[in-house]
Curated annotation (Swiss-Prot):
Main localization of the protein described in the UniProt heading: cytoplasm
Cofactor remark from the record: Binds 2 [4Fe-4S] clusters per subunit. One cluster is coordinated with 3 cysteines and an exchangeable S-adenosyl-L-methionine.
Cofactors named for this entry: [4Fe-4S] cluster
Keywords: 4Fe-4S, Cytoplasm, Iron, Iron-sulfur, Metal-binding, S-adenosyl-L-methionine, Transferase
Metabolic or biological pathway: Protein modification; protein lipoylation via endogenous pathway; protein N(6)-(lipoyl)lysine from octanoyl-[acyl-carrier-protein]
GO molecular function list: 4 iron, 4 sulfur cluster binding; lipoate synthase activity; metal ion binding
Catalytic activity: [[Fe-S] cluster scaffold protein carrying a second [4Fe-4S](2+) cluster] + N(6)-octanoyl-L-lysyl-[protein] + 2 oxidized [2Fe-2S]-[ferredoxin] + 2 S-adenosyl-L-methionine + 4 H(+) = [[Fe-S] cluster scaffold protein] + N(6)-[(R)-dihydrolipoyl]-L-lysyl-[protein] + 4 Fe(3+) + 2 hydrogen sulfide + 2 5'-deoxyadenosine + 2 L-methionine + 2 reduced [2Fe-2S]-[ferredoxin]
SMART domains the UniProt entry points to: Elp3
CDD domains: Radical_SAM
Native species: Staphylococcus aureus (strain bovine RF122 / ET3-1)
Sequence segments annotated as region (Disordered): 283-305
Stretches assigned to the Radical SAM core domain: 54-270
Protein name as annotated: Lipoyl synthase
């Protein structure tokens, strides 16, 4: 039983979601099982899975296995000793994207600190295979910090994704508690170097709120991201995946998220999604640059012809 100091906050009404289990959703779920693929949508218990899979024709594949070498205190993904790399995974991901006619695909990965290249070669090959089979699908990558291995980052950026997404997750003060194996400054450097390697590829990051940060700390984090040339920001409510994870300290209202979005845009971000259910990949198909949007339009025209 929780003590007064550990009391669990009641989830507000605005966090209730409408389930959408149409053909897109059920078809994609069957495809993932058939191809033996993982999605962060399922593994991380994302609240938007029904909207993205069911209505938007977008999905987030999680590659390099389903077991992460880290144990961040906010994350529902399994941790432990990972399996051997599956070298056929890039082709299976590419086939699945093609079969589902996905408009936008996000490719994320568990952290593989056990691998010399942090998994970057298989990751880059996945991007290339998806691009070969799906020239009109926009591709976003969401890697770990790869242990600060910038040769691995260079390998990954050479695959030319449409967006590089790497999440700061929380404010500087809370980072050691929330994700002990990462550092705030390494995340900023990873984002800065990504832009230096491929200046025309938009960079993106995400902040979870509700972990005990102050508004001033959120604004400081926005400033740090802009100082490292980050283009796109998403801000969402932290939700506790299980009793083992960090507790929610505050539920922000939709009005508060609206204010955060306005501040972010005033600070110079090109795009900001902010809301209680917003996650890193939420409405990601809208956040690509104009060149990538033209690819999406060509794909839609082909699909409807």
């Amino acid at each position: 039983m929780a003590t007064k100091n550990e009391e669990i906050l009641r989830k507000p009404d605005w966090l209730k979601i409408k389930l959408n289990t149409n053909e897109n959703y059920t078809g994609l779920k069957k495809m993932m099982r058939k191809k033996n693929l993982n999605t962060v949508c399922e593994e991380a218990k994302c609240p938007n899975i029904h909207e993205c899979w069911g209505a938007r024709r977008t999905a987030t594949f999680m590659i390099l296995g389903a077991v992460c070498t880290r144990a961040c205190r906010f994350c529902a993904v399994k941790t432990g000793l990972p399996n051997e790399l599956d070298l056929n995974e890039p082709e299976r991901v590419a086939e699945s994207v093609e079969l589902m006619n996905l408009k936008h695909v996000v490719i994320t990965a568990v952290a593989r600190d056990d691998l010399r290249d942090a998994g970057s070669n298989v990751y880059a090959e996945t991007v290339r295979k998806v691009r070969e089979r799906n020239p009109f699908t926009t591709i976003e990558i969401l890697p770990s910090d790869m242990g600060g291995d910038y040769d691995a980052l260079e390998t990954l950026m050479a695959s030319r994704p449409d967006i590089l997404n790497h999440n700061i997750e929380t404010v500087r003060r809370l980072t050691p508690r929330v994700r002990a194996r990462a550092t705030y400054d390494r995340t900023l450097e990873f984002l800065r170097r990504s832009k230096e390697l491929q200046p025309d590829i938009p960079t993106k990051s995400s902040i979870m709120v509700g972990l005990g940060e102050t508004i001033e700390e959120i604004y400081e984090t926005m400033d740090d991201l802009r100082a490292n040339d980050v283009d796109i920001l998403t801000i969402g409510q932290y939700l506790q995946p299980s009793r083992k994870h960090l507790k929610v300290q505050k539920y922000y209202t939709p009005l508060e998220f609206g204010k955060l979005r306005k501040v972010a845009m005033d600070k110079g971000f090109k795009h900001c999604q902010a809301g209680p259910l917003v996650r890193s990949s939420y409405h990601a198909d809208e956040q690509v640059n104009e060149a990538a949007k033209e690819k999406q339009r060509q794909g839609e025209a082909q699909l409807n012809s």
